Amino acid sequence: MNLFVLMKRTFDTEEKIVIETGKIQDDGAEWIINPYDEYAIEEAIQLKEKHGGTITAVTVGGEEAEKELRTALAMGCDQAVLINIEDDLDEPDQYSISQVLYHYMKDQEFDLILGGNVAIDGGSGQVAPRLAELLDIPCITTITKLEINGTDAEAERDVEGDVEKIKTTLPLLVTAQQGLNEPRYPSLPGIMKAKKKPLEELELDDLDLDEEDAEPKLKTIERFLPPKKEAGKLLQGEPAEQAKELVSLLRSEAKVI
């Protein structure tokens, strides 16, 4: 099987986030593989172990993403591709990234493309479905189980707590939801082997893609942190009195009714 994994380098949202002049200050930030993409990587590795094949990890970004690609190689991917847009696109959006990926993937032979359900830094979940639409292939999002039998595929996907079962055929694009598997940690031998595995760097010119054709369609007006949570209030008295006070607070302070 020819397996491709869409991977994104993100900052760890568990760390403190600083916003200045409308931009996230990433100096000193901890950068990681998007956690949902780790599920995709692990699923690709398990499929390769079962069916054989080659796994290619692909990311769009700057040169700094090489570190995360090497981590993917250490986990078990066979090769990696960095599509460097650092000097070409300023603040690319989901349209931009999907266009870049499409111009790369359309020339590749693939059976299955895997990606994370969402990126923890943006959370739109748009890139993979957009790419599938451009490639004109089936797309199943938020999968929690995947079985491949020849050119047939069966998947279970999370639907707000329920499960939906879907059958389709390859080639296919899927996005991974938490619970699909338990991503492995890179082993020491894996880390050593990753240093020698091929990592190709491409630019838009290599894809015959003009900057104008991948210009973002969205413009960010403002970025801000959510308000700090205030201490809760403990309501006293009988249930009827508590209910009355709660309604009053919702109207006067929360202003939701």
Curated annotation (Swiss-Prot):
Keywords: Electron transport, FAD, Flavoprotein, Transport. Binds 1 FAD per dimer. The keyword Nucleus does not apply. Transmembrane segments: none annotated. It comes from the Bacteria. GO terms for molecular function: electron transfer activity. PROSITE patterns: ETF_BETA (PS01065). Its cofactor is FAD; AMP. The electron transfer flavoprotein serves as a specific electron acceptor for other dehydrogenases. It transfers the electrons to the main respiratory chain via ETF-ubiquinone oxidoreductase (ETF dehydrogenase). Belongs to the ETF beta-subunit/FixA family. Heterodimer of an alpha and a beta subunit. This is Electron transfer flavoprotein subunit beta. It comes from Bacillus subtilis (strain 168).
